[in-house]
């Protein structure tokens, strides 16, 4: 069974384009995880503190409803409204499924930050060009197995591997305009 999952993940990674631009269509997954934040309300404006106009620290996130059998969690923060295609702001893999939150500005022990669209293994706060508000998706994925990702994996490759292995997800959306 594990070899089959590895094959599915490999196929997803191979089929995905590299780089931080457009991503393919998302896999249809059950939305059983609830993601919230004390930093901003669902659908609300993300305070400047968490953006390139402020301290650019990651916001606090909390979640519930992680399915039984989850081995690890992965977090992806992206902007589907970016002019050049979806921009990936943050990828965090190997989150302990027993954990129920990320503190503001924190990455817990054992978790791994992967490259964002700027090529940095770090949180990159919202920083849209002037104009209408962009939507920032904070998506948490439940994974039944540990997904091994190369430290130098392109964001699209890492996300494809996570989405292919995931059994469920949850999403919080915030907005920001400059």
Q: Which stretches of residues belong to each language-model region?
A:
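N-terminus-centered regions that define maturation/targeting leaders and the start
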Residues: 2-6, 12-178
């Amino acid at each position: 069974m594990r070899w089959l999952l590895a094959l599915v993940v490999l196929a997803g990674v191979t089929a995905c384009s590299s780089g931080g631009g457009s991503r393919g269509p998302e896999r249809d997954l059950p939305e059983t995880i609830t993601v919230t934040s004390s930093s901003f309300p669902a659908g609300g404006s993300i305070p400047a503190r968490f953006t390139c106009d402020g301290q650019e620290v990651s916001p606090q996130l909390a979640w519930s409803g992680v399915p039984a059998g989850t081995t690890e969690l992965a977090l992806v923060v992206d902007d589907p409204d970016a002019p050049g295609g979806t921009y990936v702001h943050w990828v965090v893999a190997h989150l302990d499924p027993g954990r129920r939150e990320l503190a503001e500005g924190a990455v817990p022990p054992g978790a791994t930050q992967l490259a964002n669209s700027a090529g940095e293994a770090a949180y990159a706060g919202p920083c849209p060009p002037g104009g209408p508000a962009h939507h920032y998706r904070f998506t948490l994925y439940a994974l039944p197995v540990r997904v091994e990702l190369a430290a130098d994996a392109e964001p699209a490759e890492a996300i494809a591997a996570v989405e292919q292995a995931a059994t469920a997800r949850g999403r919080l959306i915030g907005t920001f305009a400059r």
